[in-house]
Amino acid sequence: MSEQAQAKRKVQIGDKLRGADKVRTIPMVNEETGYQRKPDWIRVRVPANGEIQRIKSLLRKQKLHTVCEEAACPNLPECFGGGTATFMIMGDICTRRCAFCDVGFGRPNALDAQEPLHLAESVENLGLNYVVITSVDRDDLADGGAEHFAECIRQVRALTPETRIEILTPDFRPCLDTAVEILAETAPDVFNHNIETVPELYKHIRPGARYQHSLDLLKRYKALRPDVSTKSGIMVGLGETFEQVINTIKDLRTHDVDMITIGQYLQPSKHHAPVDRFVHPDEFREYARVANELGFTSVASGPMVRSSYHADLQHKGVDVGLYKP
C-alpha cells in the first residue's frame, strides 16, 4: 500500500498508529529528523534485567500496560529495576496525536471492565506503597474515562488501603466538569495533569489540547478538593525560551498547583518533534529556584526528571532533581 493510500485509509477500531503514521498530520517543521548526540549529563542507568522481566511478565499476565513502556520512558530500567511502575489504563491506543509522545494513536477498543481489579491485584502482588495511574486520552468516552479512573482508585484502596495513589490524567476535553466531579468524589492522594510545554508551542507539539483548558482543569480540581495535592509537569528542549518556561511555571502556581516537575524532552523516534537543545543542568537549577520561591510544595527539576519519576519521594517533598535548597 502506498504512503498516500495509507494516509487516506480509515482507521479501524483497535488499529494503533505509531511513528510516521501517527504524526503525519501534525504541522511540524521537520517531519523526519535525526538524533542529536546526548551530552554527558544525560545518563540512563541499566540494572540487571531480572526484576524488569518479572514485572513485565506480571503485567502481561494481567493484560496491563505501563506508560514506562508505551511512552519509551528513559527511566524504565531504573524504575522497573526498583520494583515500581506507572500503570496506563484504558488500553494502549490514544485518541490524540501529540508530536512528543510515543504512545500509539488510533480508535481504541472498548474498556475492559476487569482492568481496575487486575490493576489492584498487581499493586498488591508487587507490594507497592505508592502507585501512579495514568491513561491514554479517550475522547470517545462521554466522561473521558473519569469513572474508570475512579473505579481503579476504589479497587486499589479495597485491596491495599495503605497504598498512596497518584493519578496522571488527560485533559478531559470536552467533559471537564463531569470528570472533575467524578474524581473529586473518589479522590486520589495526588491529582496530576501535565501542562507539557509552553503555550507558544501547543499548535505544533500538543495540537489536540488547549493550554488554558489544562490550567483550568488543575485549578477547578483544587477548588473542589483543596485537601488533595495537585501536580503538573513541563518538558524543555522543544524550542521554548527561558522566559516562556518561567511564565509557565508562574501560570501553574497561580492556578493553585502544588507540585511541579521539569525535565528534558528526549525524541522517541526520528518522526517525532526534534530536540531543539539539551538544557544545561544550571538552567534546571534556575527553574527550581524560581519554583521554590513561588511556593510550590515539591519541585523536581533535572534532565532525567519525569512526571512519575520517584513520585513517592516527590509526594514526601524529597528532592529527586538537581536543586538543593
Curated annotation (Swiss-Prot):
Pfam family membership, one: LIAS_N
InterPro entries: Aldolase_TIM, Elp3/MiaA/NifB-like_rSAM, LIAS_N, Lipoyl_synth, rSAM
Keywords annotated in UniProt: 4Fe-4S, Cytoplasm, Iron, Iron-sulfur, Metal-binding, S-adenosyl-L-methionine, Transferase
One Gene Ontology term of the molecular function aspect: metal ion binding
Record-linked CDD domains: Radical_SAM
Pathway: Protein modification; protein lipoylation via endogenous pathway; protein N(6)-(lipoyl)lysine from octanoyl-[acyl-carrier-protein]: step 2/2
Localization per Swiss-Prot or TrEMBL: Cytoplasm
Enzyme Commission (EC) number: 2.8.1.8
Domain (Radical SAM core) ranges: 80-297
Protein name (Swiss-Prot/TrEMBL): Lipoyl synthase
Originating organism: Alcanivorax borkumensis (strain ATCC 700651 / DSM 11573 / NCIMB 13689 / SK2)
Lineage: Bacteria, Pseudomonadati, Pseudomonadota, Gammaproteobacteria, Oceanospirillales
